[in-house]
Amino acid sequence: KINLESYSVGHVWKKNVQCNWKIYWENFSECLHCPNIHPELSDLVPLFKRRLTDIKDHPEWSILKDQNNNPKYQGGLKEGSQTWSYDGSAQGHTIESIQKEMESRGQIYISTWPSMFLGIYGDHIRIVRLIPKGPEEVELIAEWLFEKETINDDNYDKSNVVDFAILVMN
């Protein structure tokens, strides 16, 4: 359970993408392109190296899930990582209420198709809205939410999180 009242918007990013919103969603929903286009993300989330977004996308997932604890076969973040950032570090700030879920999955996604997805990570939440501007253009608006304690910590470098996500979304 997450108490959003304890969060503040730490960064907002907007970009117009020259594609139909349906194409954007399709690209977001699969990971066939991830190893080649997003090598940094595929390193952080080893399952993506296999062009999968969920272990259940593999036809033999029920057999594989019990054979190997490697995140490349089970999902989740690479060993030692806590969040989606350049170095995988949450810099000492984690969302305590979801840590059990984060240990096995690495992230939680909630989509309200066709206009928004929410990513919950080890130390932050990212909301991305898609606003169709025409048949061949969609505006992306991404907002990063951080717990107030995190965003007020002078030692927390939010660019580690924000810049990593922008690299992936760009």
Which residues does each predicted region cover?
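C-terminal catalytic domain of Rieske-type non-heme iron oxygenases
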Residues: 1-170
